[in-house]
Amino acid sequence: MIAARGAPEIEKAKLRLEIAELQAVLNAKEQQLLELQSTISTGASNGGEPESKQDHQKLSNDDIARYSRQLILPDFGIGGQLKLKNSAVLIVGIGGLGCPAAQYLAGAGCGSLGLVDYDQVERSNLHRQTLHTVARCGLSKAESARIALLELNPHCHITCHASLLNRFNAMDIMHGYDVVLDCSDNVATRYLLNDACVMLGKPLVSGSALKLDGQITVYNYGTQGPCYRCIFPVPPPPEAVTNCGDGGVLGAVTGTIGAMQALEAIKLIVGLGDVLAGRLLIFDGSSCQFRNIRIRSKRANCHVCSDQPLITQLIDYEVFCGMHATDKDNPLQLLEPEQRITVVDYQKSLQDKPHLLLDVRAQAEFEICQLPQAINVPLAQILDGSYLQQLDAQFKSSGFPIVVVCRRGNDSQIAVQHMKNQFPEHFIRDLKGGLHAWTNQIDENFPIY
């Protein structure tokens, strides 16, 4: 019986070893492919400018065969295709918006594409960032997208900028392109791109998507087309900003908006149709309705695009906005140190003692995972006051300490700040770093999302 049980275990061990060896071979092949793509003439450089744009005067037979379905459009034709072939478009952010935008621009025959993204591919990206694959997890998003785009259209020149765009490198990177697409997911980058586009005289196709909703417009186009600062002179407070990582998004929504960004870029290059300048297109995915609303024209006293601008060079946009220029965790600092407790101290001093653990995430997130004994009270119920009386009664009857937790330690700070304003005498603490800190420091098997 012992031998019989041992045989399957040996076989399982052999299979695990074989899988590990195959994975190593796959990783090596991916690296070889990446190196090969870097050397081919249609590949990418990592320099500060797009590949040298050529003045193509005619289309090749391959071009005619490849782009025939758009060549026969009456308002497009040979002239429109040549304009695309001689154009260069910069896409900032190769995520949920940037992937479909890049895919359609490369497919349509855009001559040069610049891809800007500092980040690497992660599993949580794959449901919406459709240029990337499981095999390329850990690879630069710009490099991963380049591989996919060259497979789609090897005639497209692609320049990768695998770095974080900032005030020091933005002008050098952007100046060689005709159109810029803002596919980022943070406020600081939006202001940076806007100001740089105004200073360089380039149109900015701006898209955003969150949950089931999306928006798109074109800034800095035409004599009366506003820039981003005309609409939003002052950035919102950091605690009011929600990105895809915090609020969630459906992949098909980002695909819809990203494809429309590619469409607007093509229209700008070719001179096709009415450009979406001075208008905001709003997409409601829950009802599949589009609304097209008029937005204000240029602001006469705009700090960057007016006749007498106050901003004539790029500034520190992280300081200006009070938040990082990435879509990564953007930790708030709303509380004093004594109003917070680390996950290590919580486990040592409170977890096994009577206390009230409030999880202020939305119910859908609470159902994904939760700490033992946690009670789900969404942040909205604390801010609107509907739970405060019950909380006060619970504290007065038990005297138990109150610890507040959320996903990353931001919403919990907002909740603690609000509750302390109402009940300054109560023992209320924020669990610093939230559930992400719990996974990283206490229990690596606790789900992270």
UniProtKB/Swiss-Prot annotation:
Its EC number is 2.7.7.80, 2.8.1.11. In the N-terminal section; belongs to the HesA/MoeB/ThiF family. UBA4 subfamily. Residues 351-447 form the Rhodanese domain. Zn(2+) binds at residues 227, 230, 302, 305. Pfam families: Rhodanese (PF00581), ThiF (PF00899). It is an enzyme of class 2 (transferase). Pathway: tRNA modification; 5-methoxycarbonylmethyl-2-thiouridine-tRNA biosynthesis; Cofactor biosynthesis; molybdopterin biosynthesis. Plays a central role in 2-thiolation of mcm(5)S(2)U at tRNA wobble positions of cytosolic tRNA(Lys), tRNA(Glu) and tRNA(Gln). Also essential during biosynthesis of the molybdenum cofactor. Acts by mediating the C-terminal thiocarboxylation of sulfur carriers URM1 and MOCS2A. Its N-terminus first activates URM1 and MOCS2A as acyl-adenylates (-COAMP), then the persulfide sulfur on the catalytic cysteine is transferred to URM1 and MOCS2A to form thiocarboxylation (-COSH) of their C-terminus. This is Adenylyltransferase and sulfurtransferase MOCS3. One of its GO terms (biological process) is tRNA wobble position uridine thiolation. The active site is at 244 (glycyl thioester intermediate), 406 (cysteine persulfide intermediate). GO terms for cellular component: cytosol. Keywords: ATP-binding, Cytoplasm, Metal-binding, Molybdenum cofactor biosynthesis, Multifunctional enzyme, Nucleotide-binding, Nucleotidyltransferase, Transferase, tRNA processing, Zinc. Binds 1 zinc ion per subunit.
